[in-house]
Swiss-Prot record:
It is found in: Cytoplasm. It is an enzyme of class 2 (transferase). Belongs to the PanB family. Homodecamer; pentamer of dimers. InterPro entries: Pantoate_hydroxy_MeTrfase, Pyrv/PenolPyrv_kinase-like_dom, Pyrv_kinase-like_dom_sf. Pfam families: Pantoate_transf. GO terms for molecular function: 3-methyl-2-oxobutanoate hydroxymethyltransferase activity; magnesium ion binding. It catalyses: 3-methyl-2-oxobutanoate + (6R)-5,10-methylene-5,6,7,8-tetrahydrofolate + H2O = 2-dehydropantoate + (6S)-5,6,7,8-tetrahydrofolate. Its EC number is 2.1.2.11. Disulfide bonds: none annotated. It comes from Shigella dysenteriae serotype 1 (strain Sd197). The gene is panB. This is 3-methyl-2-oxobutanoate hydroxymethyltransferase. NCBIfam families: panB, PRK00311.1. GO terms for cellular component: cytoplasm.
Length: 264
């Protein structure tokens, strides 16, 4: 199979072809996803909640991310693997580079970091040193204590303008992808249209170039609160491979996420 690259996603954006991505944390699921054509996988710090049982992503370490990235890479040898740099792993550009090198050696193609204009120098340093960067704006889970919970971001003119400014700044600094989480559809559309780089949404409506879901949400195996933007594809199909195929097909056709999964 031909490897999936950042250029592959850029081509999707240019041709207005939606694409689906998903999280994975181990070999078996990574292989299943790759076998079914989900070739863009995030090794997310969401593993702190879904795998380790914490109530936030904050306890996750770089070593945790590297360990799971190694396993996922074995399952998806030709996939485009994104890996989160966890909480306090990129407080300075130098620290970010050192930790990015660790997860890149583990098999990641790109690192994802949460935050806006304050990360410009970090993004520049990483990209100048051949580390591709995916930005993450909107609801950034590592900032849960600042936000006071998991809440929709970017409502109101001032907040939406600030997020658009952040997105443009990250792109100008060299970011090659952007994740937008839990923002109004109208803002997601503004940002997606303003950027040259592909935008991946989660809780941002069906107006972004791609979509991502935490795999546990996509299969209905998350305990406790179920996010508004989540859909249990396994409940409709009864078969995990069929669920993956349905998720991919609904994203590519624009059926998912629907209005019931979106914010305004």
């Amino acid at each position: 199979m031909k490897p999936t690259t950042i250029a592959s996603l850029q081509k999707c954006k240019q041709e207005k072809k939606r694409f689906a991505t998903i999280t994975a944390y181990d070999y078996s699921f990574a292989k299943l996803f790759a076998d079914e054509g989900l070739n863009v996988i995030l090794v997310g710090d969401s593993l702190g909640m879904t795998v380790q049982g914490h109530d936030s992503t904050l306890p996750v370490t770089v070593a945790d991310i590297a360990y799971h990235t190694t396993a996922v890479r074995r399952g998806a040898p030709n996939g485009l693997l994104l890996a989160d740099l966890p909480f306090m792993a990129y407080a300075t550009p130098e620290q970010a580079f050192e930790n990015a090198a660790t997860v890149m050696r583990a098999g990641a193609n790109m690192v994802k970091i949460e935050g806006g204009e304050w990360l410009v120098e970090t993004v520049k340093m990483l990209t100048e040193r051949a580390v591709p960067v995916c930005g993450h704006l909107g609801l950034t889970p590592q900032s849960v204590n600042i936000f006071g919970g998991y809440k929709v971001q970017g409502r109101g003119d001032e907040a939406s303008d600030r997020l658009l400014s952040d997105a443009l700044a990250l792109e100008a600094a060299g970011a090659q992808l952007l994740v937008l989480e839990c923002v109004p559809v109208e803002l997601a559309k503004r940002i997606t249209e303003a950027l040259v780089i592909p935008v991946i949404g989660i809780g941002a409506g069906n107006v972004t170039d791609g979509q991502i879901l935490v795999m546990h949400d996509a299969f209905g195996i998350t305990g406790g609160h179920i996010p508004k933007f989540a859909k249990n594809f396994l409940a409709e199909t009864g078969d995990i491979r069929a669920a993956v195929r349905q998720y991919k097909a609904e994203v590519e056709s624009g059926v998912y996420p629907g209005e019931e999964h979106s914010f305004h």
